[in-house]
């Protein structure tokens, strides 16, 4: 179970001490006390990969896996249950997360197809951190295959996905557009599934790219055997990159990381965030 595994090793203390080491505000501490002030004072986002003040989000490399990144607001937003994410003028963190797939590509040294990438947010029951964070990583190969094999069953409105994914039931819908610029998946969930708007805390939401847009998957926490952790559909080992092992890594500047200029601040914590 994703939550149980992660709770056991939430933080790794590297340099400076912090009170209440294994607490649910660890991610917010990293955002508000490290990434944001270091970007403001020293023009370096570390320990984050990116701080975007204009759009109001950061990108942080998670300790789990080689290719997993987290997209988080610079504002205090607890999670999928937060009413502000459904506001008409709410920042579209899914659009930011989709753009952040480039960090995954940089880690595998190769461009990835749309259907190799997934985004996921866990339910209140299925997470350990109380700062909204969208997981960006490769999709599990078996989930990718299931979506391809059952593509004809996924339409423009929410409907039960024909088979279980990772042993759990999901609702699915297809979004036929390449970006999230004009649509908020949180709102599609809240307004598209009866009763979801008043019960968002118990929902998990996953987005998987497809050639002509996206597939959205929504699951609901139902108890100890299903905590609503859509992150279970992601592969933090990114086994999909095995198909590139017979090809040469991309060497272009697009996939080379540049070292940040200025001061490199001490890194205190890296979370196992879920």
Where are each of the predicted segments found?
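N-terminal secretory signal peptides that target proteins for export/translocation
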Residues: 1-2
């Amino acid at each position: 179970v994703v939550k149980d595994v992660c709770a056991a090793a939430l933080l790794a203390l590297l340099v400076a001490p912090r009170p209440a080491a294994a607490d649910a505000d660890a991610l917010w501490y990293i955002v508000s006390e490290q990434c944001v002030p270091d970007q403001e004072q020293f023009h370096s986002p570390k320990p984050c990969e990116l701080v975007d003040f204009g759009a109001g989000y950061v990108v942080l490399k998670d300790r789990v896996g080689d290719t997993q990144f987290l997209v988080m607001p610079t504002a205090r937003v607890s999670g999928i249950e937060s009413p502000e994410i459904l506001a008409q003028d709410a920042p579209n963190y899914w659009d930011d997360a989709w753009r952040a797939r480039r960090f995954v590509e940089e880690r595998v040294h190769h461009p990835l197809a749309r259907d190799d990438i997934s985004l996921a947010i866990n339910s209140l029951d299925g997470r350990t951190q109380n700062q909204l964070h969208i997981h960006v990583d490769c999709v599990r190969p078996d989930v990718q295959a299931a979506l391809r094999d059952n593509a004809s069953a996924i339409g423009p409105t929410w409907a039960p996905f024909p088979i279980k994914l990772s042993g759990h039931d999901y609702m699915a819908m297809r979004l036929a557009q390449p970006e999230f610029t004009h649509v908020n998946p949180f709102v599609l969930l809240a307004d598209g599934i009866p009763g979801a708007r008043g019960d968002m805390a118990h929902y998990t939401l996953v987005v998987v790219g497809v050639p002509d847009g996206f597939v959205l998957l929504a699951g609901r926490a139902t108890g100890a055997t299903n905590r609503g952790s859509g992150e279970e559909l992601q592969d933090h080992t990114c086994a999909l990159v095995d198909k590139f092992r017979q090809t040469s890594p991309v060497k272009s500047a697009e996939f080379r990381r540049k070292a940040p200029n200025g001061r490199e601040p001490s890194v205190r914590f890296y979370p196992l965030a879920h």
